[in-house]
């Protein structure tokens, strides 16, 4: 898929979600969250830094938050290009999308689940990402500031980086949508237009998109770090716990299903790697999929504290 086609597809997904008439509280709040993210991107970010010439890069790790933001970013990228093309003296049919791949950085801090690594590579091709992957330091965690510093040295034209962090994430509470990095970091602008989203918004839009989702979420993970500090969320353990699924409508009416005459409850998750299958076979419990969890305060309950 070409980047122009990927961006146009993401625009169609986003536009379709914004026109859902089934106004559950979750969908209505997610529509408002999308509108605010679009405002940040189109009215505040793209007017200061061009998304078409390498001034902006995208931080991507294959997680649910990053993927949601990537879909919205590509959607706005298409709209930005379309508006500029419409305002040109030349007809739209003679306009060509000026980018082949989206500049992207993957900060690979820890030993990662092979399923997630595979998903990052697969979606890099799907969304036409020019992926720079930071190097781990002899098996140890790499310092994030140093990893970004290495990236900036290789891509000095980068002035701003889009980051899919939310207010409920560690150290996210006081962040702003647009802010400069701290003094001990390489100098660039942090673009964080997803801060106001909550967990229900993330699941609702991602499940509706019908895009491939990292298979680890289907195994009960809700927050994915390294293999040594991430487990399925204990609040999704299949014992006496019987959580409700809040996203049945989004799953059944997901983008593209109606057009194909489908009304299935299947969810597009990526394959689990052989290595991870063996690892998960040693778990003594079974878990509901990650999207059964909607409490932001419990999202990181599967992360092991060092």
From Swiss-Prot:
Residues annotated to bind FAD: 59, 107, 164, 182-185, 190, 300
Which reactions fall under this protein's catalytic activity?
Answer: FMN + ATP + H(+) = FAD + diphosphate
Question: Where in the cell does this protein reside?
Answer: Cytoplasm
Keyword match ATP-binding? yes
What would you give as a GO molecular function for this chain, any one? Answer: FMN adenylyltransferase activity
What's its EC?
2.7.7.2
Q: Which Pfam families match?
A: PAPS_reduct (PF01507)
Alphabetically list the UniProt keywords: ATP-binding, Cytoplasm, FAD, Flavoprotein, FMN, Nucleotide-binding, Nucleotidyltransferase, Transferase
Of which family is this protein a member? Belongs to the PAPS reductase family. FAD1 subfamily.
Q: What else is known?
A: FAD1 is essential for growth.
Task of the protein: Catalyzes the adenylation of flavin mononucleotide (FMN) to form flavin adenine dinucleotide (FAD) coenzyme.
What PANTHER family is this protein classified in? FAD SYNTHASE, FAD SYNTHETASE-RELATED FMN ADENYLYLTRANSFERASE
What name is this protein filed under? Flavin adenine dinucleotide synthase
């Amino acid at each position: 898929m070409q980047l122009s086609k990927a961006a146009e597809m993401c625009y169609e997904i986003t536009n379709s979600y914004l026109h859902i008439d089934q106004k559950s509280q979750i969908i209505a709040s997610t529509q408002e969250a999308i509108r605010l993210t679009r405002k940040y991107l189109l009215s505040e970010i793209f007017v200061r830094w061009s998304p078409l010439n390498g001034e902006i890069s995208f931080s991507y790790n294959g997680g649910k938050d990053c993927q949601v933001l990537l879909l919205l970013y590509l959607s706005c990228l298409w709209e930005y290009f379309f508006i500029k093309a419409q305002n040109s003296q030349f007809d739209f049919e003679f306009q060509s999308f000026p980018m082949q791949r989206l500049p992207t950085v993957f900060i690979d801090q820890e030993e990662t689940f092979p399923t997630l690594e595979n998903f990052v590579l697969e979606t890099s091709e799907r969304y036409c990402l020019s992926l720079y992957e930071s190097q781990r330091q002899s098996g140890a965690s790499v310092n994030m500031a140093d990893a970004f510093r290495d990236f900036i040295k290789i891509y000095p034209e980068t002035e701003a980086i889009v980051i899919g962090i939310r207010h409920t994430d560690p150290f996210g509470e006081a962040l702003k949508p647009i802010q400069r990095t701290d003094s001990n970091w390489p100098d660039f602008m942090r673009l964080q237009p997803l801060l106001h989203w909550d967990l229900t918004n993330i699941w609702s839009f991602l499940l509706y998109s019908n895009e491939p989702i990292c298979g680890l979420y289907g195994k009960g993970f809700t927050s994915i770090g390294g293999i040594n500090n991430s487990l399925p969320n204990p609040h999704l353990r299949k014992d006496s716990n019987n959580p409700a699924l809040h996203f049945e409508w989004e799953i059944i009416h997901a983008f593209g299903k109606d057009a194909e005459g489908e009304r299935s409850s299947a969810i597009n998750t990526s394959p689990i790697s052989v290595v991870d299958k063996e690892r998960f076979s040693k778990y003594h419990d079974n878990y509901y999929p990650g999207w059964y969890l909607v409490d932001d305060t419990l999202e990181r309950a599967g992360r092991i504290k060092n």
